[in-house]
Amino acid sequence: NFLFNNNKLEYLINLKRNKNKKINIFIVPFWGEIYTNSFFENLLPSLKSKNNLEWIKKNYDVEIHLYVDSNFYNFQKKYKITNKFFKLNNFKINTLDNFIDKKRDELSSKILNSYIDHAKKCIKKNAMSINLCADFILPENYLKNIALITHGKPFCYTHTQLRVNKSILKTIKKYKKNDKIEINNKNLINLALKYPF
């Protein structure tokens, strides 16, 4: 109780338990062909799978923050993802060039300032943050499970991913239909163990 004097911990518990249904998903800043292709070919289709994006949209006040370079829009056209799709799914697209700090190294300032921007948005809205990378592949129910496990609890969580060899992507394609990657936890873990980094 020494960390939260004057019943502040109790206030946080009640706030989370009773009111807070805000989630900001932070896609770690990405640019370049490899990571941008990976976002469109893997992360985005896995976000569309069962009990991920659709479920969390129905049950929470969610925003998905992307921090990308200006070439992102060329890839968006290539993959035929409309602005309407991004808007309907509450994607907020931020261009990395807006986060350059002339007093720092360009690359590190883009990354650091994107994190700071996201943190400020979470604090302002009292929103939980879920961090994902452009090269992640999420199993079905991933976002639902994270939201249900953490909802109503006044503490942080962490999640880890297995690093895998890129040859796993050939097998992942078997799970991709209608621009969705539908794979359950067990199958994804088994595949990751077959293709260690």
Annotate each PLM feature.
Residues N24, K50-H65:
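Short loop->beta transition adjacent to catalytic acidic/histidine clusters or analogous donor-positioning motifs
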